[in-house]
Amino acid sequence: MSDVQERLHILLDYWIEHNSEHEKEFRDWAEKAASLSTEAAQLLQKAATKMVAVGNDLMKAREALTKEMEGH
């Protein structure tokens, strides 16, 4: 395994966890914002949903890297 592969694997694990934390935080704040601004709450929920999609792509990238590492 190259240094770049090893570093990327570590970063992907970190980014996946970090992204998940942000998604949860956005949803928490959307609930709090609901009484202040429906639009703000909806936009925070929308951002959280996008974070889920980002997380899915990060997991797919990690899986692809893992497959590549196992293949060599």
Language model features by range: what are they?
Residues S2-A30:
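N-terminal acidic leader/helix
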Residues K32-K67:
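Short, charge-rich amphipathic interface segments used for partner binding and complex assembly
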